[in-house]
Design a protein with these regions (language model features):
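Membrane-interface interhelical connector segments
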Residues: 204-232
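Small-residue-rich segments of transmembrane alpha-helices in multi-pass membrane proteins
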Residues: 61-68, 72, 125-140, 188-198, ...
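Membrane-interface loop-to-helix entry segments
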Residues: 78, 82-85, 97-98, 110-140, ...
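Hydrophobic, membrane-embedded alpha-helices of multi-pass small-molecule transporters
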Residues: 3-21, 30-42, 68-71, 99-106, ...
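Extracellular/periplasmic helix-loop-helix junctions in multi-pass membrane proteins
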Residues: 25, 262-268, 280-299
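Membrane-water interface regions at transmembrane-helix termini and the short interhelical loops
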Residues: 46, 85-88, 103-125, 176-180, ...
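Membrane helical hairpin/interfacial module
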Residues: 17-100, 104-105, 304
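Hydrophobic alpha-helical segments and their helix-loop junctions in multi-pass secondary transporters
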Residues: 3-6, 73-84, 127-152, 201, ...
C-alpha cells in the first residue's frame, strides 16, 4: 500500500512527462484548461471510489472483469508509449530505440519490486526535478515577450493536454493510504504545465513553441547573472527519470488489474513474454510504434472510462439497497 507522501511524489514525478514534455507545445491556455479538466475528472473518480482501489472496485461481474482485462492491455500500451517518448530526451538521436528500450526494461524491473519501492524512488527524484524545472522557469522570465503570451491554440490542444495529464491518474488503480489525493497532484501539474507553456511561447514565439521538445530548446538559452547556462543535459536526464516513473506507474496499474482478475501471481512465463513483446515493440520503426500504441491506448482509455461507469453503477445500486 502506497503511503501518502510516496503516492503524491509518484503522481507528480510521472506528471512531469506531459507537463514539460508535451504541454509546452500546446499553448498555456490549452494546458491550463485541459489540466483543470483532468483534475476535475480525477477528483470525481476519487469521490466515487471512496478510498478504494479502482482495480478492486471495478473487477466485479463478467462485464467489469472484461473491461478490466482490456484496460490492463491499454495501460501496457500506454507504458510503451511513455517509454517511446523517452527518445525525445535526445532530439539529435530521436530515431534510436535504445533509450526507450532501456526505460522500459528498468520500469518493468521496478514494477516487479512493487509500488512502495517505486514510491521511494519518486520521493527522492521529486525535489530534484522541482528545483531544476523551477530554476529554468524563473530565470527564463527575463526573456519573455508579452506580445507572444496571447492565448493561442485550438480546442484539440486542450483535449490533448487533458488526456496526457490524466495519465498519472493510473495511481487510482493502486492500493493507497487513506486521504491520498491524486487529483491534487494533477492540479499542481496543470499549473506547472501552463507555466512551462507560457515560458516556452514567450521565449521562442508561438510557432517556435509548437516544435517537439520545445522546453528543451528553452533550457539552452537560460541566462543566470548574465551568463548563458546550458541545462539541456540536466533536462534530458530529468525527462528520462520522469519517463521512468510514468512508465513504471502504468505498468504497476496494469499489474494491479491483472492481480484483481487472477489473485494468484502471474507465472514467470507470462512476465517474460510481456517483457520480450515490449522490447520488440519498441524496436519497431517509430511511426509504426506510435500508431500501434495509439490504437492500444485508445482502446484502453475507452475501457477505463467504462470501468468508471461500472463503479458508479455499482455504487448507485448499493445506495438503493441501503435505502
Amino acid at each position: 500500500m502506497l503511503k501518502r507522501r510516496k503516492s503524491f511524489a509518484l503522481t507528480l514525478t510521472a506528471a512531469a512527462v506531459p507537463a514539460f514534455g508535451l504541454c509546452p507545445s500546446l499553448g498555456w491556455a490549452g494546458a491550463l484548461l485541459g489540466g483543470a479538466a483532468a483534475a476535475w475528472i480525477l477528483n470525481r473518480t476519487e469521490r466515487a471510489l471512496r478510498g478504494r482501489s479502482l482495480a478492486k472496485a471495478a473487477a466485479c461481474g463478467a462485464v467489469g472483469r472484461a473491461a478490466a482485462a482490456v484496460s490492463a492491455l491499454g495501460l501496457f500500451g500506454l507504458a510503451l508509449w511513455a517509454a517511446g517518448r523517452s527518445r525525445l530526451a535526445f532530439p539529435e538521436t530521436a530515431g534510436s530505440p535504445l533509450a526507450a528500450a532501456l526505460i522500459f526494461a528498468l520500469s518493468f524491473w521496478a514494477a516487479r519490486s512493487g509500488a512502495e519501492a517505486v514510491g521511494r524512488c519518486a520521493a527522492v527524484l521529486l525535489p530534484l526535478l522541482a528545483v531544476l524545472y523551477g530554476v529554468i522557469l524563473v530565470f527564463s522570465l527575463s526573456q519573455l515577450r508579452l506580445s507572444w503570451l496571447l492565448p493561442t491554440g485550438t480546442p484539440r490542444a486542450g483535449l490533448r493536454a487533458c488526456a496526457s495529464l490524466l495519465l498519472p491518474g493510473a495511481a487510482l488503480f493502486l492500493r493507497r493510504e487513506d486521504g491520498v489525493s491524486v487529483s491534487r497532484g494533477t492540479a499542481i501539474a496543470a499549473l506547472a504545465a501552463a507555466a512551462a507553456a507560457a515560458v516556452t511561447a514567450g521565449t521562442l514565439s508561438p510557432p517556435g513553441a509548437a516544435a517537439r521538445a520545445a522546453f528543451l530548446t528553452v533550457s539552452r538559452s537560460v541566462s543566470i547573472l548574465g551568463v548563458i547556462q546550458r541545462f539541456e543535459a540536466l533536462i534530458s536526464g530529468a525527462m528520462l527519470m520522469s519517463g521512468f516513473c510514468l512508465c513504471t506507474l502504468l505498468l504497476l496499474a496494469a499489474r494491479e488489474l491483472l492481480d484483481s482478475l487472477a489473485p494468484k501471481k502471474s507465472s514467470a512465463a507470462v512476465k517474460t513474454s510481456a517483457f520480450a513483446a515490449g522490447l520488440i515493440f519498441l524496436w519497431l520503426p517509430t511511426p509504426e510504434t506510435f500508431r500501434l500504441t495509439g490504437v492500444t491506448a485508445i482502446c484502453g482509455g475507452v475501457a477505463c472510462a467504462f470501468l468508471l461507469f461500472v463503479v458508479s453503477k455499482n455504487k448507485s445500486q448499493k445506495n438503493e439497497e441501503n435505502a
